[in-house]
């Protein structure tokens, strides 16, 4: 089984930057994307955009050469989650995610659903603790562990299920790299270049701090999408990380 995305249209990037596209207007989203270079970043499509515009928005981005992280955080019974992950793979996305709190059987089913895709399978990662959550939020859910402790427990479960990595805060990255190994990928939202507004993220870091902490892929949204010159902003971020992207 192979994905529908054409590998010939994809442009390989060495950048760890994933730009979060949070648009409710398709034309505005594509107008922004046409300002940037797929050598400088990958793109993340979340629930709002995918619900509004459907799979075609992913194809539109792929046709422009971009790898796409489909950030839908699947969390359902194992069979349903497995079919959803397989559908994402069939769409040709570069990365897809599930909620680790869905449990071991769900995550294992999701991983097994990607076996038929072979080398074309997307990276499969799990969400541990949302970066907007604090200890008081977890306590409301009956979780007495700190966000860091709960995230590490879920990350270990994710690795035991054979997934490729986790979404975690940058503050957890150093410990996770040490505990879970270099090959276990860490994807981190809440990344803000120096001087950017924190927005609704509670646990944030600069790109340079995130790279030093062991983050493999850093999700950056408004500091790029709301920049007066997003292409220049991306070049500057990549340069600060020692990445020459073209």
Swiss-Prot record:
Disulfide bonds: none
PROSITE patterns assigned: OMPDECASE
Keyword Oxidoreductase: no
GO biological process: 'de novo' pyrimidine nucleobase biosynthetic process; 'de novo' UMP biosynthetic process
Enzyme class, broadest EC rank: lyase
Catalytic reaction equation(s): orotidine 5'-phosphate + H(+) = UMP + CO2
EC number: 4.1.1.23
Single GO molecular function: orotidine-5'-phosphate decarboxylase activity
Keywords: Decarboxylase, Lyase, Pyrimidine biosynthesis
Family matches, as Pfam families: OMPdecase
Pathway in which the depicted protein is active: Pyrimidine metabolism; UMP biosynthesis via de novo pathway; UMP from orotate: step 2/2
Superkingdom as given in the UniProt entry: Bacteria
Secretion signal, residue range per the UniProt entry: none
Gene Ontology CC, one term: cytosol
Catalytic-site annotation from UniProt: 73
Residues bound to substrate: 22, 44, 71-80, 131, 192, 201, 221-222
Oligomeric form and interacting partners: Homodimer.
PANTHER family: OROTIDINE 5'-PHOSPHATE DECARBOXYLASE
NCBIfam families linked: PRK00230.1, pyrF
Annotated HAMAP family: OMPdecase_type1_B (MF_01200_B)
Family: Belongs to the OMP decarboxylase family. Type 1 subfamily.
Function: Catalyzes the decarboxylation of orotidine 5'-monophosphate (OMP) to uridine 5'-monophosphate (UMP).
Protein name from the UniProt record: Orotidine 5'-phosphate decarboxylase
Source organism of this protein record: Enterobacter sp. (strain 638)
């Amino acid at each position: 089984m192979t994905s529908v995305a054409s590998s010939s249209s994809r442009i390989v990037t060495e950048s760890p930057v994933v730009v979060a596209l949070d648009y409710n207007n398709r034309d505005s989203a594509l107008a922004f994307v046409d300002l940037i270079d797929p050598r400088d970043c990958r793109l993340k499509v979340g629930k709002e955009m995918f619900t509004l515009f459907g799979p075609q928005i992913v194809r539109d981005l792929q046709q422009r050469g971009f790898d796409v992280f489909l950030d839908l955080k699947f969390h359902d019974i194992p069979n349903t989650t497995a079919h959803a992950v397989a559908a994402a793979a069939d769409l040709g996305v570069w990365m897809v995610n599930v909620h680790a709190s869905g449990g071991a059987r769900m995550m294992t089913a999701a991983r097994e659903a990607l076996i038929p895709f072979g080398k074309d399978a997307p990276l499969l990662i799990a969400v541990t603790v949302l970066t907007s959550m604090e200890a008081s939020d977890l306590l409301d859910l009956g979780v007495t562990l700190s966000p860091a402790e709960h995230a590490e427990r879920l990350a270990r479960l994710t690795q035991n299920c054979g997934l490729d990595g986790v979404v975690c805060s940058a503050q957890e990255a150093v410990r996770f790299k040490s505990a879970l190994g270099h090959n276990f990928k860490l994807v981190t939202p809440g990344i803000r270049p120096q001087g950017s507004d924190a927005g609704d993220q509670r646990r944030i870091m600069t790109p340079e701090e995130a790279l030093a902490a062991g983050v493999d892929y850093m999700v950056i949204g408004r500091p790029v999408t709301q920049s007066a010159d997003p292409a220049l902003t991306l070049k500057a971020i990549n340069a600060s990380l020692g990445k020459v992207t073209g």
